[in-house]
Structures are given as C-alpha cells and as structure tokens.
Amino acid sequence: MNVPRETIAAIATAQGRGGVGIVRISGPLAGAAAKAISGRELKPRFAHYGPFLSEQEEVLDEGIVLYFPGPNSFTGEDVLELQGHGGPIVLDMLLQRCLELGCRLARPGEFSERAFLNDKLDLAQAEAIADLIEASSAQAARNALRSLQGAFSQRVYNLTEQLIALRIYVEAAIDFPEEEIDFLADGHVLSMLDAVRDELSTVLREAGQGALLRDGMTVVIAGRPNAGKSSLLNALAGREAAIVTDIAGTTRDILREHIHIDGMPLHVVDTAGLRDTEDQVEKIGVERALKAISEADRVLLVVDATAAEAADPFALWPEFLEQRPDPAKVTLIRNKADLTGEPIALETCDDGHVTISLSAMAAGSGLELLRDHLKACMGYEQTSESSFSARRRHLEALHYASAALEHGRAQLTLAGAGELLAEDLRQAQQSLGEITGAFSSDDLLGRIFSSFCIGK
C-alpha cells in the first residue's frame, strides 16, 4: 500500500494529569528524534531511563524512552515512545520538541491507520482497539480483546476461503463447458454453498451478539394502557423518568431512557398503550409504538396480571405479533404479581418467549430477575471462545453477503444459472472483504479512523 512517509507525533495518554504521560512518534524521523531527545544511541526494544533534552540540551523532563525500528513495531514504521510525567505542560513541551525535529501532529487514529496500511492488523482488528478503549463492561472488553487478537477476522477469512474455493469450481465449469459439469446433478456446488450459508449464519448471529454488547440493546416496553409500562421504565432507570397515573393513556409518545446494568448499555423505550382509539394524538402514539416494536432488539410485553386478559395476552393485539413475529425476542412481563400472589419467577415457554412475573411498584419484586435476564440477552458473562466484538457496519456487510448467497442459490436451483451464481459469490466475497479492509474505499477508512483517539 502507499503509506505516507511523514513522521507523526501525538500525546498517547488521556487528557488531564496523571503519574505517567506518553508521547508517541512514528515514521522515518523517529530514530533521529530518539537520539536527539535522549542524547545517546538507543538499543532497540530496550527501556532506557534518562533525561529528555531540548534543542539547547536543557532537561525538559526525565523518564523512559523506547525505540522500535520498523517493521517490528505497532505501526510497521520506526516508532519512538517517550514515557515521562503526566502533567499537560510537560507533555506539551515534549510534543513541541518532536515538532521541532520535523514531526507533524498526528490525526485521530493515524497510528492505527498506518498499522493497517502496513498490514500489521486488519480493519476489524483496528476497530477493536477503539472498542477496547471504549468498553463499558468487562464482557465488552473481553470481546474487543478477542477481536483485536483476530478471532472475528479469522472467522471472516475462513468464510472467504470457502467462497474462493466455491468460486473456482463454479467459474471453471463456466469457462470450460467441454468438461460438462452439471451443477445440479453434481450436487457438489449446492453442498458447498449450503455449508458456507450455514457458517455465515452462525457468524452473523455471534456478530449480532457482539454488536449488542458494544452498541447497547434497544428494549421496547409495550402493552395495554395502565399495565405498568411507565412504572417498569422508572424501576429500571432508578428514577421518575415517566409520569405514572391511574389514567389510561398517560403516555402518548415515545419516551427514551439510556441506562446501564453492570456497565452494559441499554436503550429503553417506553411506548403508548396499545389499544383502539379515536383520539388522533393517541393514535399517532400507537403507530409509533408499533414501529418501535418492529425495530427493537427485545420487547418487554407488559400485562396486568390481575386482569382477565392476562390469560392470553398475545391474542389481544394481533398487530403486535405482526410487528414482532419472533417469540424468542419477546419477554412477557406479568406485572402486579404482588396483588395476585403468584411467585416471582422466570419461565421459558415452548414457543421460545420468556415470561417473568414481577411487580414494578414493589421493592424486591423481581426487578433483579429482569435485569439478569436482560444481561443474559446481551451475552453477559458469556464464556464462549467464539465471542467477539462487532459493529453495525460489520452486520450490514454480513447481511449483504448472506442475501447474495440466498439469491445465488435461488438462481442456481430455479434456473441453473451458473453465471449469475458466480456474480453473487463475487459480491458476497467483496462484502466480507469490507469487514477486514480487503475491499474498502478511502472514504470508509477515513470515517473509521477519524473516530479514534489521537495517539492511537
């Protein structure tokens, strides 16, 4: 790749005061800067303690200097790290010294960008650095570290290799028709294609779990008026985020609350009560509620356990089932269990949905059970070696690849169109390449790395 030859410098530690502060340099001038600032020749990859010198050989600070000649460094270039005292004035003096020696200020994420351009890490690994820094829970940090170590990338590479093998077989049959390979009669292409589709489906599911841990899960609270939806929102938020009254229809619009459960981000959405109404404002609220339900990662369907309709809550509002057809993403909340006397409990039903009996208004009434359930939905304390962090753009690329394979399979089985299958396989491979950076536009790379910290 065409890697810039300018030497860059930046403060690599967070703003503010601390015991230690780091200034990082990368580029062809790093070796000369190391000698000028330390006043001596440095042994590569060894820590040297001593003064940091100005142009007039005045002592700016003292600390540890480390020199890593390329390509055996983080960026693949010559890298210098100055580890001094963590005061902002001291660090700024060291940074100014680097600029005097011919360095320029690094852009946000430029060190990681150079590591990517020098094939020291792929794009998914580079993004994992930022995810590890921004992790809001121990599980999110573990997943980000696994992605940084290449767990996610390896899954994508394995899929890509399978696609390449399949493309070779398909395109050989197209280019050499005299070999008379019959796609359908042979059965080999279909079996290979189905194997790739199955593996892609598994990776997509695991990536979705990783994205929930990174970006947060959108939880929509839905149900009839006066079922206790707003009370449940307040209980989860730990404050009076929503107005609670005995008057049906108090909540008429979407109310959003961002909360954390053991460091795990949740975007909780309270919605208008689901009912037929002639009130135009409330009707708009119901429409927005149904839209929120269709977009949710998880739906908490709240029912009043004291009401007769609680016996079959899903039958009360067929539009709900139309918007959220997957029962595995629905948690039925039987609220007001303290009034019915039913035990606080969680039950997984035959169709896949979960039922929790609790009371949103009573202390110690099952809310901890609900919190644990929501954490489990996000993959909290997941010990699987397959867990990794992922981003929304990764999911989009995986979905696009999956759609291309589905389309290619249909073209093959319905029309025997090997040429169309070959094009779909190419598109699927390109989508996977966008995850690791094998196929990425300059605009995409710029957007990704500009979101990083300066010095990373």
Curated annotation (Swiss-Prot):
- Name the EC number(s): 3.6.-.-
Q: Which UniProt keywords apply?
A: Cytoplasm, GTP-binding, Hydrolase, Magnesium, Metal-binding, Nucleotide-binding, Potassium, tRNA processing
Q: Which GO terms describe its molecular function?
A: GTP binding; GTPase activity; metal ion binding
Mention one GO biological process in which this protein takes part, according to its record. Answer: tRNA wobble uridine modification
Q: Where in the cell is it found?
A: Cytoplasm
* GO CC term, one of those recorded: cytosol
Binding positions (K(+)): N226, T245, I247, T250
Write out the residues that bind (6S)-5-formyl-5,6,7,8-tetrahydrofolate.
R24, E81, K120, K456
Transmembrane stretches in the record are none
Q: What is its main location?
A: cytoplasm
Q: Which residues bind Mg(2+)?
A: S230, T251
- Main enzyme class: hydrolase
Q: How is the cofactor bound?
A: Binds 1 potassium ion per subunit.
PROSITE patterns per the record?
Answer: G_TRME
What is the protein's name according to its record?
tRNA modification GTPase MnmE
**Gene giving rise to this polypeptide:** mnmE
